[in-house]
UniProtKB/Swiss-Prot annotation:
This is Protein DETOXIFICATION 36. It holds the Pfam family MatE. The chain crosses the membrane at residues 54-74, 87-107, 137-157, 166-186, 203-223, 225-245, 271-293, 313-333, 355-375, 399-419, 427-447, 456-476. It is found in: Membrane. Belongs to the multi antimicrobial extrusion (MATE) (TC 2.A.66.1) family. GO terms for biological process: xenobiotic detoxification by transmembrane export across the plasma membrane. It comes from Arabidopsis thaliana (Mouse-ear cress). The keyword Cell wall biogenesis/degradation does not apply. GO terms for cellular component: membrane.
Amino acid sequence: MGSEATTAVNNLQQPLLESTKSEADFRMESVLTDTHLSYFRRIYLASLIEMKYLFHLAAPAIFVYVINNGMSMLTRIFAGRLGSMQLAAASLGNSGFNMFTLGLMLGMGSAVETLCGQAHGAHRYDMLGVYLQRSTIVLVITGLPMTLLFIFSKPLLISLGEPADVASVASVFVYGMIPMIFAYAVNFPIQKFLQSQSIVTPSAYISAATLVIHLILSWLSVFKFGWGLLGLSVVHSLSWWIIVLAQIIYIKISPRCRRTWDGFSWKAFDGLWDFFQLSAASAVMLCLESWYSQILVLLAGLLKDPELALDSLAICMSISAMSFMVSVGFNAAASVRVSNELGAGNPRSAAFSTAVTTGVSFLLSLFEAIVILSWRHVISYIFTDSPAVAEAVAELSPFLAITIVLNGVQPVLSGVAVGCGWQAYVAYVNIGCYYIVGIPIGYVLGFTYDMGARGIWTGMIGGTLMQTIILVIVTFRTDWDKEVEKASRRLDQWEDTSPLLKQ
């Protein structure tokens, strides 16, 4: 008994993410199945292993998402220097067209997250490059019709009720973002390709360096060359292409990608329709989640005192978005860990990783919620000097705290769903919970019962809570041995280019 415990402890001291095949894949599984160790000893040792994996993956992922949001924020700041009209146009372009494109492309890119993660865990390294290329092809094709939305942005905005002068200026900004569509189409498959191999730190360095370049180029565009709003949006697109090219160079020269990138392959053109179906399910799952909070703001604009409601909700949504960045990092970590362990044939490790990641994210979100409630009367003064808005934010703080706690669990479970390949199922759950339950209840409470923003938010919290409970139950009842079998069968079918979805 003592020798097995000593071996388990010694295993913890080995380099975690650069181990040999057997060490990296079966270390935690061997600990969890070691009957010579007591139950609590197994949990303790496995937790140490998982925490190392978790924070190695989550911390850089959080940093990357924060930096990428920082680029959009800098663009809006420089647009504000051009004038209030330009700021409104840039905000409209970013929150409308850019966020729609970002959500769609990021969602479709998560399909490669499932396949690359499971293939890497199963040591089918040659297929990772094929999945990367296949996803890129699908996303580039998807980007072509989206380009038409950007080209005809002016009449589209006018038809949606925007003033003609705002629509005209916004369309100029949107034109400069067209290259960004295809930067997204290449970037997100690359990002998931690297994450599935636990290669996350290089992307963080690249994003940080690009943020500095973006700042310099934006300043030159506005103050040195006078290129105006179009110049700012072109710089934003260029910054994303810098990220893409830097990651491509890294893949080409890094020894860590030699097994997974063999160059371009004609296999990438096989099974594109089935790959598109999986990508579309992933996109629907993510878009339904990201659009949900936007609908809360839209409904608030229909209230009797929309200005106060929108101001207070904007502050709450900004705080929620900052907190959500942490959850997104754990979402990425959960997806990678679960898909890797399923691909490697480790059902207990996949289940344990799910429990640890969810628990850590929940505890962090609970701490954030307590801080929000403690500072609810003063936190709004970071954004505004208005006492009326501060009071409204204080009234909404309990709803914000509940949302933050739910966001500590729900994105992690969505990451587990991506790791398992459940995107289509979660998309149906999202439709039912968010759009059939949450929004109608919020509308009735907010308008029929005159509860205002609190009523709308109560209904939408109800939808999120229902979705979270369903995902918790589904995850808790998961037969992880069967998920390992499904992962193996999925990889066999994709490698043979037979339909993935006919399982």
